[in-house]
Amino acid sequence: PRLRRLTGLSPLRAP
């Protein structure tokens, strides 16, 4: 559950 929150911000910050 905590990894999903980080994954949502990771893709948005990558591009």
Swiss-Prot record:
Keywords: Secreted
Keyword Secreted listed: yes
Tissue: Expressed by the venom gland.
Predominant location: secreted
GO terms under cellular component: extracellular region
Disulfide bonds: none
Similarity comment: family membership: Belongs to the bradykinin-related peptide family.
Name of the protein: Beta-campsomerin
